[in-house]
């Protein structure tokens, strides 16, 4: 088995998908999981990007189906901007498409600034822009878990195969969640699900960005990764890619294994 085949298997990627079936399966997964846990629904941060838009709409479909069957569940979509978000219009368009039961907003800027200032006061050192970006992501995780704990909701994550293979998420930030409805999907497969769901093109054709850096606002994921999502998706779907792309992805996959595992102990061997 090649490394490419191994990664495809470990990340549960299918070379091709039936969008309607994927939507049904993922909505059913959400329904079954929330019923099993006894939770009252889901909470998810909505950025206006493809991934949170898709996960949010799947969550809303799941809770509506539960209610139609006589159950009780809700979905809270939460906006978590750091000050003024440049693509706020996209976030509002995403909310209009998702149609969540509730939509709340918490601006994380004051929290992040307070910690950054205290860090500098205590250490004499200023947080790097990259490290501060991770603080933003982890602050958003704290907010979602606060809502989840208060309302009895499960926190959804938006990680998918193209992020998982590159480790392109913040550990205990956007990587902190109770369940992941997009697992196994490549970026382009996620787009096909949004098309099937009737999402506005603007939400899945826009350039993906984590938008965590103050010094490089709206920097694209592909610029930061140095690889295009088409190349990542081709690799994950079992297609032939250049040796350079294969080597880069396999190196990233190995280096970021710790992000896909629970914290290591002396009884684990995945890190050896």
Swiss-Prot record:
Induction: By heat shock, salt stress, oxidative stress, glucose limitation and oxygen limitation. Pfam families: NAD_synthase. Optimum temperature is 40-45 degrees Celsius. GO terms for cellular component: cytoplasm. CDD domains: NAD_synthase (cd00553). Keywords: ATP-binding, Ligase, Magnesium, Metal-binding, NAD, Nucleotide-binding, Phosphoprotein, Sporulation, Stress response. It is an enzyme of class 6 (ligase). Phosphorylated during sporulation. Pathway: Cofactor biosynthesis; NAD(+) biosynthesis; NAD(+) from deamido-NAD(+) (ammonia route): step 1/1. It catalyses: deamido-NAD(+) + NH4(+) + ATP = AMP + diphosphate + NAD(+) + H(+). Deamido-NAD(+) binds at residues 33, 138, 171, 178, 224, 258-259. It comes from the Bacteria. ATP binds at residues 45-52, 79, 85, 158, 187, 209. Its EC number is 6.3.1.5. Mg(2+) binds at residues 51, 163. GO terms for biological process: NAD biosynthetic process; sporulation resulting in formation of a cellular spore. Gene3D superfamilies: HUPs. One of its GO terms (molecular function) is NAD+ synthase activity. Belongs to the NAD synthetase family. Homodimer. Catalyzes the ATP-dependent amidation of deamido-NAD to form NAD. Uses ammonia as a nitrogen source. This is NH(3)-dependent NAD(+) synthetase. The gene is nadE.
């Amino acid at each position: 088995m090649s490394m490419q085949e191994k990664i495809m298997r470990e990340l549960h990627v299918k070379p091709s998908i039936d969008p309607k079936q994927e939507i049904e399966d993922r909505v059913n997964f959400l329904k079954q999981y929330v019923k099993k846990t006894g939770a009252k629904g889901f909470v998810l941060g909505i950025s206006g990007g493809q991934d949170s838009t898709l996960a949010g709409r799947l969550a809303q479909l799941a809770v509506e189906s539960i209610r139609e069957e006589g159950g009780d569940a809700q979905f809270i979509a939460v906006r978590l901007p750091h000050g003024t978000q440049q693509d706020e219009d996209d976030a509002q368009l995403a909310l209009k498409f998702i149609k969540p039961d509730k939509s709340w907003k918490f601006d994380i800027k004051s929290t992040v600034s307070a910690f950054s200032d205290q860090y500098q006061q205590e250490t004499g050192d200023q947080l790097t822009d990259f490290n501060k970006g991770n603080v933003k992501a982890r602050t958003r995780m704290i907010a979602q878990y606060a809502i989840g704990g208060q309302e009895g909701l499960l926190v959804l994550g938006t990680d998918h195969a193209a992020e998982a293979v590159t480790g392109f998420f913040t550990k205990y930030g956007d990587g902190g969640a109770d369940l992941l409805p997009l697992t196994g999907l490549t970026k382009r497969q996620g787009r096909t699900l949004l098309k099937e769901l009737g999402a506005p093109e603007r939400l899945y054709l826009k350039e993906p960005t984590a938008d965590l850096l103050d010094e490089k606002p709206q920097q694209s994921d592909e610029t930061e990764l140095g690889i295009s999502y088409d190349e990542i998706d081709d690799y994950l779907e079992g297609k032939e890619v250049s040796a350079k792309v294969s080597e880069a992805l396999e190196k990233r996959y190995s280096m970021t294994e710790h992000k896909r595992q629970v914290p290591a102990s002396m009884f684990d061997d995945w890190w050896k």
